[in-house]
């Protein structure tokens, strides 16, 4: 029997400390340099030398403001605030590496699918096929308020919207441009064949999109899809869409049961039990 191959992802966030709250005060800690590009390019080079498979970048939209009904502690301790956009780091890190992959968290609840499709196609081009998307739907009421809502959408409704969102993205990434659409014919003055570029028309419960995908086909077209939801609805979503799932169980027994349930959900979704790679937080 062939040996299983372990895959290693580093886990970070475009902020001070990430989940190691308070460690930024240690004399040897350099995470306050997160604002500077060399901090990230040096990290990328180090991970590549260490034969890591990828760098997983977390993100949040919103702030932690529940404790004492304010953000005072969040700001004093720098608990994922301030936090910068993770997607903008990727091209710089890709430029100094050859094999390192990048999984970037983007909350789809507050992004229009048409624009997000272009952003990830652009990242896929610039990384030459090394980009992944960690799909999240959000969990902070502060984010909902910042985006013009009174509170978060109900949990399961967020995943219903996410299913439709992915349906649109697949149409844009996989269906708008045929494989032979890009000719780059300088003599004939034809960059792309109009007959092979198609308008996407989607009219659903939550989204209406009518347009051509703005980016030409990228190396992967659809990025590697990560998901980290542990609820029943989140696992059903992962079973339908994900290629990689991130879990952080409190012990082995819980982790084993989480993976077993996920494998069952994959079969129910018409996929093979081993179609998804599971990454465990450590």
Annotate each language-model stretch with its function.
Residues 1-96, 220-223:
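N-terminal beta1-alpha1-beta2 module of alpha/beta enzyme domains
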Residues 4, 112-241, 269, 274:
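Internal, glycine-rich beta/alpha segment that forms the wall or movable "lid"
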Residues 6-10, 55-57, 100-106, 129-135, ...:
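Hydrophobic faces of well-ordered beta-strands that scaffold small-molecule active sites
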Residues 14, 61, 106-110, 137-141, ...:
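Active-site-proximal loop/turn and secondary-structure-junction residues that shape catalytic pockets
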Residues 19-23, 66-69, 136, 144-146, ...:
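Short, solvent-exposed loop/turn and secondary-structure capping segments
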Residues 25-37, 74-81, 101-113, 152-158, ...:
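The substrate-binding groove and active-site-proximal loops of carbohydrate-active enzymes
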Residues 40, 44, 87-91, 117-121, ...:
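Generic structural signal for well-ordered alpha-helices
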Residues 236-281:
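Glycine-rich, aromatic-lined ligand/substrate-binding cores of catalytic
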